């Protein structure tokens, strides 16, 4: 009933507008709110001050005219008519408060009260009457809420006993007979009745379920035997691959041994060249760059530095700085070697790029290499 009452009230208000008041509003909309003639009896200081637009000034009218002036509307309303409307509203509110229990128990009493309030609202034009109407709406909404609580709804309730009785009746089981069989524990008829009853219930319930597809085995029936996997036959090609893999490490080992022997021979040859040079001129030191740099080949220069590093590591030669802070190399005698074991040895890394090699050749004016390539090394490089 609260839904019907709330739906009727706006329709009564919309249809019950006073035509005389609508004409008055359209007449007052043509006036500007800030013009001197829009407010009667207003002070000059009040007219000069800018006014903030109210809620009624921002709402557009149905006819497309300007906004309504509330002051002019109140002045044109009959005071006696407004007084009568307020008196009727107060009487209606008092009646609702006194007859609250009757309205809650009756079926159409709340609807009649709302229709009466809609009739009174047709003559409301000022805020005082609108306040009384709002007060009545609060009372009416409380009454509607109370009537809604009185409505009985069984959507969320579940009566278990009633459900069991209905289920037993559908299964064809007499509740009295079932109680006697339950009390008699030695009776064998209970299992038959229970099984037969659930069978009836299952047939009824299976109509509401979708049937699922059965499982089909890819190999046929369950008792079938799985096929025996065929044994793999080893091919002779795999045996040849294993023999080749066993032969490869031996071949690589021989190649590594040949390179190692060539490196040892080259180191001994370079040491012999250094010792021969110092035997011919023992007072003149040999520049390290003049000794290892090959002006015609950058890779050959790198190989010479690599081979000389073994001579320095084994203690057959040493590198020191001369007066110009440039590195020189000289062989070490056997007597000096035995006495120099207590000296601290330093390890260094030489970084040489192609540009550095060109600059060294140009600065030291190296034209011919001191370490010439041997025939065995030429054969290996070829």
From Swiss-Prot:
Task: According to the UniProt record, list the residues that bear Phosphoserine.
Answer: 374
Compositional bias (Acidic residues): 56-78
Indicate the transmembrane segments per the record: none
Residue span of region Disordered: 1-80
Annotated localization: Nucleus; Chromosome, Telomere
Q: Which keywords, in A-to-Z order, does the entry hold?
A: Chromosome, DNA damage, DNA recombination, DNA repair, Nucleus, Phosphoprotein, Telomere
Per UniProt, the ranges with Basic and acidic residues bias are 1-21, 42-55
Which GO BP terms sit in this record? DNA damage response; DNA recombination; DNA repair
Q: Name one GO cellular component term.
A: nuclear body
Low complexity composition-biased segments: 31-41
Q: Which Pfam families match?
A: Nse4-Nse3_bdg (PF15412), Nse4_C (PF08743)
Modified-residue entries (Phosphothreonine), positions: 342
Its biological purpose is as follows:
Component of the SMC5-SMC6 complex, a complex involved in repair of DNA double-strand breaks by homologous recombination. The complex may promote sister chromatid homologous recombination by recruiting the SMC1-SMC3 cohesin complex to double-strand breaks. The complex is required for telomere maintenance via recombination and mediates sumoylation of shelterin complex (telosome) components.
Protein family: Belongs to the NSE4 family.
State how it assembles.
Answer: Component of the SMC5-SMC6 complex which consists at least of SMC5, SMC6, NSMCE2, NSMCE1, NSMCE4A or EID3 and NSMCE3. NSMCE1, NSMCE4A or EID3 and NSMCE3 probably form a subcomplex that bridges the head domains of the SMC5:SMC6 heterodimer. Interacts with NSMCE3.
Matching PANTHER family? NON-STRUCTURAL MAINTENANCE OF CHROMOSOMES ELEMENT 4, NON-STRUCTURAL MAINTENANCE OF CHROMOSOMES ELEMENT 4 HOMOLOG A
Recorded protein name is Non-structural maintenance of chromosomes element 4 homolog A
Q: Which organism is it from?
A: Bos taurus (Bovine)
């Amino acid at each position: 009933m609260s839904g019907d009452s709330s739906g009727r009230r706006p329709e009564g208000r919309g249809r019950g507008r006073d035509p005389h008041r609508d004409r008055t509003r359209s007449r007052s909309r043509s006036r500007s709110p800030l013009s001197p003639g829009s407010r009667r009896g207003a002070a000059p200081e009040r007219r000069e001050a800018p006014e903030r637009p109210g809620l009624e000034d921002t709402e557009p009218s149905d006819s497309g005219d300007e906004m309504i002036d509330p002051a002019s509307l109140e002045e044109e309303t009959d005071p006696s008519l407004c007084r009568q409307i307020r008196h009727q509203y107060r009487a209606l509110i008092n009646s609702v408060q006194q007859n609250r229990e009757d309205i809650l128990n009756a079926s159409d009493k709340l609807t009649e009260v709302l229709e009466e309030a809609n009739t009174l609202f047709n003559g409301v034009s000022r805020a005082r009457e609108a306040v009384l109407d709002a007060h009545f709406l609060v009372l009416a909404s409380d009454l509607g809420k109370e009537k809604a609580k009185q409505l009985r709804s069984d959507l969320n309730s579940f009566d278990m006993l009633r459900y069991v009785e209905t289920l037993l009746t559908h299964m064809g089981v007499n509740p009295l007979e079932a109680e006697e069989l339950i009390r008699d524990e030695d009776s064998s008829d209970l299992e038959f009745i229970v099984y037969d009853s659930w069978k009836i219930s299952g047939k009824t319930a299976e109509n509401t379920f979708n049937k699922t597809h059965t499982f089909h085995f890819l190999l046929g029936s369950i008792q079938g035997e799985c096929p025996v996997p065929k044994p793999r036959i080893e091919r002779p090609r795999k045996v040849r691959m294993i023999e080749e893999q066993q032969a490869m490490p031996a071949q690589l080992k021989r190649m590594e041994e040949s390179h190692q022997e060539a490196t040892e021979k080259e180191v001994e040859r370079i040491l012999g060249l250094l010792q021969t040079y110092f035997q011919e001129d023992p007072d003149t030191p040999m520049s390290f760059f003049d000794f290892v740099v090959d002006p015609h080949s950058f890779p050959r220069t790198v190989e010479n530095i690599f081979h000389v590093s073994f001579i320095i590591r084994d203690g057959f030669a040493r590198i020191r700085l001369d007066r110009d802070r440039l590195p020189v190399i000289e062989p070490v005698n056997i007597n000096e070697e035995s006495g120099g074991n207590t000296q601290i040895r330093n390890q260094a890394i030489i970084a040489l790029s192609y540009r550095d090699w060109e600059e060294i050749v140009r600065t030291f004016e190296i034209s011919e290499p001191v370490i010439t390539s041997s025939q065995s090394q030429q054969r290996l490089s070829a």
